[in-house]
């Protein structure tokens, strides 16, 4: 099993869109951080934790071409607004992705991204 941190920046990323780095040194490449997402990779499955708005960039950078399941930690924008990028995995497999979230997050996702749940995704509330 591998655990891959796809992003570990703040809710606005580092640097922020206005160029602010906070206490991070802009000369250090490691201080350019995308928003939080992670991947659990097993021999059979790729399990994504959260879909940050930077998800497309993260998946391309790590050459991830398959997602089987998605777990959402909570319903904030920096954990959920990359959900649209999951559509390509349905297009490739024609199989709905399994999504796991608590009831509040599940409701939020279905209310705000209903088009993703028509065929693409099945949800289980935790």
Question: Predicted segment positions?
Answer:
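Binuclear metal-dependent hydrolase catalytic cores
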Residues: 1-126
């Amino acid at each position: 099993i591998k655990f891959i941190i796809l992003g570990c920046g703040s809710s606005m990323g580092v640097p922020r869109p206005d160029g602010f780095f906070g206490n991070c040194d802009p000369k250090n490449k490691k201080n350019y951080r995308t928003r939080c997402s992670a991947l659990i990779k097993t021999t059979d499955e790729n399990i994504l934790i959260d879909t940050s708005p930077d998800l497309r960039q993260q998946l391309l950078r790590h050459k991830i071409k398959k997602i089987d399941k998605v777990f959402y930690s909570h319903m904030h924008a920096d954990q959920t607004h990359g959900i649209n990028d999951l559509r390509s995995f349905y297009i490739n497999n024609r199989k709905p992705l399994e999504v796991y979230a608590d009831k509040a997050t599940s409701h939020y996702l279905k209310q705000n991204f209903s088009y993703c749940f028509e065929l693409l995704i099945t949800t289980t509330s935790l």
